[in-house]
């Protein structure tokens, strides 16, 4: 399973870092976790078209995780008419908002054959290559974290967690059983050093920090230094690629 981080910033863009999105490649297929930024330029640079995307998984409705759906759905509604990604949403109001924007701003109807599905907690996707389990978290209503399994590997994408105490309230509850091969964790809504205890209780093989800000960077670096020799920690930047 290969991960390419297309966007690693938090609620707003920072220099050289766009809002959240990750391309997941497994078994010759391409999937996307969150679309907080327009991923079309990055996909094009990788030689991918919307028709090459099998499924898209959105963790929660905030704009820094969904805004990139607008240009993708726009282009799939008039140019890439054969593109058929399954778009899995925590609430259908996201689709309704995109539909209204296309009709109002572009006078363009939403392509009727585009597939949007609302999911709830539990296994939300399994095509025999990639499996996604959604777990509720406390960030907001209809906010989820994902456990993505492919190629015999398990990766946790936290999405956004509870404000103030996400590592304790949410991450600790998810970080059970067989250690994750990788955990992709956010670090802007709380002190990232709150991860210390739950990470040490069940260390993932690798930990990737995303969705951090310039004002949380110092604390993220302190957390990474504390974890040295225990768990490899990477502060992600856009374009970072890793095979799990």
Predicted regions and their residues:
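Binuclear metal-ion centers of metallo-dependent hydrolases, dominated by the metallo-beta-lactamase
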Residues: 168-182, 191-244
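Structural motif
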Residues: 29-31, 52-55, 130, 153-157, ...
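Structured loop/turn residues at beta-strand edges in well-structured enzyme cores
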Residues: 48-51, 112, 128-130, 177-178, ...
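Short, well-ordered alpha-helical microsegments
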Residues: 40-41, 95, 141-143, 164-167, ...
